[in-house]
Amino acid sequence: MLKQVFNQEGLVRRKWRWFFLLVLAAYVLAIVLMCFTPQPNLFKGIQTPHVIAVGRLRFLVVPLNSLWSLPQLSTPLELSWVIGQNVMNVFLLYPLVFMIHCLWKNWHSSSKSLWLGFRISLIIELTQLLLDVLIDANRVFELDDLWTNSLGALLAFYSYRWLHHRLSRCL
């Protein structure tokens, strides 16, 4: 089955390319909805320590805030929220970057993947700030999101590299 989808370079074959591009576009839309939809009071009762409010803007600029804040979390809900949010941030860009590797070979390096993940993450965070200025979307600029999203992009590269290695032995 993989031989039908991928060529010897590990890229998606021409007849599957449209499908991967469609899935990629759908996933970009999902990211837009997840990251830019306003969240007015959706998470009452869940407090993230060290959030700084400047007018309508909210910032969380403490590096590794989740680790330093664990003792301050008082309920299982808060603990699961913080851990779950970090895990989800690692995997937010993973499918996107993995599909990019399957479609275009010019991203095939760990440094390019890491840089791509960081730039996409920074664009997301800055756009959330802009949305807070324009429509009070109740979003938080989180420094940890930058490194967790970038880590997900790096994991996508290594997953792709593993798949490419497996494919090269099969093809």
Predicted regions mapped to residue ranges:
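Alpha-helical transmembrane segments of polytopic membrane proteins
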Residues: 85-88, 145-149
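Non-cytosolic membrane-interface motifs at loop->transmembrane helix junctions
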Residues: 137-146
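Bulky hydrophobic segments
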Residues: 2-138, 154-171
